[in-house]
C-alpha cells in the first residue's frame, strides 16, 4: 500500500521476488495516493526504486517526494475557464478498458475545485463514456464533461505498468454549453456584420457605377 513503509516495501519486494531480472529503473514506482508529510500538513506523492548490485542483490530503496502543491502550479486550471469553473486531476486506474461504459479513476492530484463524486468513495471518480468518444462524470450532483489524456509513466514491460495514469480536465456541462452558446452568438454576429458590410459595399459600388 501507499503508506510510508509500503512505499519502500512495494518496490523492494517486487524486485526481490523477481530476482532483479530487470533494471532498477524498471522497478521504479510512483505512489497512486498522496499522503501527508511527517510533521507537516503538506501532501506529496513519492517515486521510489530499488538499489540493485551487479550480481542482482537487492539491498535497499531510494526515493524522492514531490509536493502536490508544486504539481498544482503546473496544472493551471484557470486555462480551462476564466471563471475557474474547470478542474484538472491527475488520476490513476488499473482498469484495462471501459467496463460497462464506466472507468474508475483514483484522484492523485487535484488542481481547481476538489469535486466529490456522488456515486463512488471519496477519492474515486466514475468516468462514463457518452458513446461519441467523450466522457462525463457526475460530481457534486452536476454533470461534468471529462477529457482524458494518457500520461506515459511506465514502459509496457514494467512491473507497475498496470497502473495507468491520466491527466483529466473537467468542465461543468452547463458552463460548457454556455461557452458554446457564446461562441455561437459571436459567430452569428460576425456573419451578420460580414453580410451587412457586403451589402453596403455592393450598394456603394452600384451607386458609384450609376
Model-derived features with residue positions:
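Solvent-exposed, extracytoplasmic
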Residues: 57-108
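Extracellular/periplasmic juxtamembrane segments that couple receptor/chemosensory ectodomains to their
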Residues: 41-53, 57-60, 111-186
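Short regulatory "switch" loops immediately downstream of catalytic or recognition motifs
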Residues: 13-19, 52, 92-95, 148-156
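Extracytoplasmic/periplasmic ligand-binding sensor regions of membrane-associated signaling proteins
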Residues: 1-63
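Short helix-terminating capping/connector loops at secondary-structure junctions
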Residues: 23-25, 83-84, 160-162
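Cytoplasm-proximal transmembrane signaling helix
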Residues: 92, 166-210
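Short, intrinsically disordered, charge-balanced linker/junction segments flanking boundaries
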Residues: 1-2, 100, 205-210
Amino acid at each position: 500500500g501507499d503508506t510510508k513503509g509500503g512505499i519502500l516495501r512495494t518496490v523492494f519486494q517486487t524486485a526481490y521476488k523477481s530476482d532483479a531480472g530487470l533494471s532498477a529503473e524498471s522497478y521504479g514506482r510512483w505512489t497512486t495516493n498522496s499522503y501527508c508529510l511527517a510533521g507537516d500538513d503538506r501532501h506529496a506523492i513519492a517515486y521510489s526504486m530499488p538499489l540493485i548490485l551487479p550480481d542482482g542483490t537487492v539491498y535497499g530503496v531510494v526515493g524522492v517526494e514531490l509536493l502536490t502543491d508544486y504539481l498544482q502550479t503546473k496544472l493551471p486550471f484557470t486555462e480551462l475557464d476564466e471563471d475557474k469553473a474547470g478542474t484538472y486531476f491527475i488520476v490513476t486506474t488499473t482498469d484495462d478498458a471501459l467496463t460497462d461504459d464506466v472507468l474508475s479513476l483514483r484522484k492523485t492530484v487535484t488542481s481547481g475545485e476538489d469535486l466529490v463524486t456522488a456515486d463512488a468513495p471519496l477519492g474515486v471518480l466514475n468516468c462514463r463514456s457518452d458513446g461519441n468518444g467523450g466522457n462525463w462524470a457526475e460530481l457534486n450532483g452536476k454533470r461534468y464533461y471529462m477529457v482524458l489524456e494518457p500520461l506515459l509513466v511506465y514502459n509496457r514491460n514494467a512491473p507497475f505498468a498496470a497502473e495507468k495514469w491520466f491527466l483529466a480536465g473537467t468542465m461543468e456541462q452547463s458552463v460548457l454549453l454556455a461557452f458554446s452558446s457564446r461562441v455561437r452568438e459571436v459567430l452569428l454576429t460576425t456573419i451578420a456584420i460580414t453580410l451587412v458590410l457586403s451589402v453596403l459595399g455592393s450598394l456603394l459600388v452600384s451607386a458609384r457605377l450609376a
